[in-house]
C-alpha cells in the first residue's frame, strides 16, 4: 500500500498530554417536529486530538451530520458541552461563533452550500474576503493553487448552475481548505466524485493532515474509512464503537 493510501496511525487520546481540539461531554440533540420531540444524539462523549484523521461512520439517520453540525458551530446542543479549540461553544455569542468558524474551521457540506451568483473562483475566495487578512495578490494565488489541486482550474469562472455535481463538490472542498483551517469537517466529501477524483482529493487531504490539519469526516464510503486512523461508529444517535480498525469497518460496509 502506498504512503498516500495508507491509514494514518490512530492517536491514543488517553496517553496524550495535548488538550483535545474538539471535546464533547454528555451531548444530546433533539429536534422539535410539530408536537413531537425527536432525539438525534444521546449522551455523546468524544475527544478529538489535534492532527487526527477520524471518520464518523454509521447508517443514514444515525446522527453523523448532526454531530458535525454541532462541532462546526452551525447548530447548538440541546444539552451537554461542546468545546472547539478550547472554547465552550455554548457560551459564545453569535459573533464569536462566526469568528471561530471563520478562523479555525473548514466545513465541506454535503449540499455544497455554494453562492449561486458567484463563480467557482469567487466562491472559494469568499472566506478570505471575510477574514480580511490577505491582500488581493495573495488571495488570488491561494485560490488558483487550490483550483488546480482539486482539478477544476478550467472552470474557475463558471457559476454553480453551470457545473456538475462533482465539480460543485470540488469547489466546496477548495472553499473549506482555502483559509488553512485547523479543523476540517467533511460531510460525505466523496459522495459526488468518481473513483479517480475521489482518490486525488483524499490524497490531498492526507497531505494536509500530515502537515497538522485535523480532519473529521462523516461517510458511508469505504474508501474514506479505509484511510482513517480512527473510526467512531454511531447507531441511533449513540456511539457504539470507537477506535475500530479501519479495515474491519470498511469490509463490513462493503458487504452491507
What are these model-derived regions, one by one?
Residues 1-30, 241-256:
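ABC-family P-loop ATPase nucleotide-binding domain
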Residues 19-228, 234:
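ABC family nucleotide-binding domain
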Residues 231-244:
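H-loop (His-switch) and adjacent beta-strand-loop-beta switch element
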Amino acid at each position: 500500500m502506498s504512503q498516500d493510501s495508507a491509514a494514518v496511525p490512530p492517536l491514543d487520546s488517553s496517553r496524550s498530554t495535548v488538550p483535545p481540539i474538539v471535546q464533547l461531554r454528555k451531548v444530546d440533540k433533539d429536534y422539535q417536529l410539530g408536537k413531537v420531540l425527536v432525539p438525534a444524539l444521546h449522551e455523546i462523549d468524544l475527544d478529538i486530538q489535534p492532527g487526527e484523521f477520524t471518520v464518523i461512520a454509521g447508517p443514514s439517520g444515525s446522527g453523523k451530520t448532526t454531530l458535525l453540525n454541532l462541532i462546526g458551530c452551525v447548530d447548538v446542543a440541546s444539552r451537554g458541552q461542546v468545546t472547539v479549540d478550547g472554547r465552550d461553544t455554548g457560551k459564545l455569542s453569535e459573533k464569536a461563533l462566526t469568528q471561530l468558524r471563520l478562523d479555525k474551521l473548514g466545513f465541506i457540506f454535503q449540499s455544497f452550500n455554494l453562492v449561486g451568483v458567484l463563480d467557482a473562483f469567487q466562491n472559494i475566495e469568499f472566506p478570505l474576503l471575510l477574514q480580511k487578512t490577505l491582500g488581493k495578490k495573495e488571495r488570488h494565488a491561494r485560490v488558483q493553487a487550490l483550483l488546480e489541486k482539486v482539478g477544476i482550474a478550467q472552470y474557475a469562472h463558471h457559476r454553480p448552475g453551470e457545473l456538475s455535481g462533482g465539480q460543485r463538490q470540488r469547489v466546496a472542498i477548495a472553499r473549506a481548505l482555502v483559509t488553512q483551517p485547523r479543523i476540517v469537517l467533511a460531510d460525505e466529501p466523496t459522495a459526488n466524485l468518481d473513483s479517480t477524483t475521489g482518490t486525488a482529493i483524499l490524497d490531498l487531504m492526507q497531505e494536509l493532515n500530515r502537515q497538522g490539519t485535523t480532519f473529521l469526516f462523516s461517510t458511508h464510503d469505504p474508501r474514506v474509512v479505509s484511510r482513517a486512523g480512527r473510526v467512531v461508529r454511531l447507531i441511533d444517535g449513540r456511539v457504539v464503537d470507537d477506535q475500530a480498525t479501519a479495515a474491519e469497518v470498511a469490509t463490513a460496509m462493503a458487504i452491507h
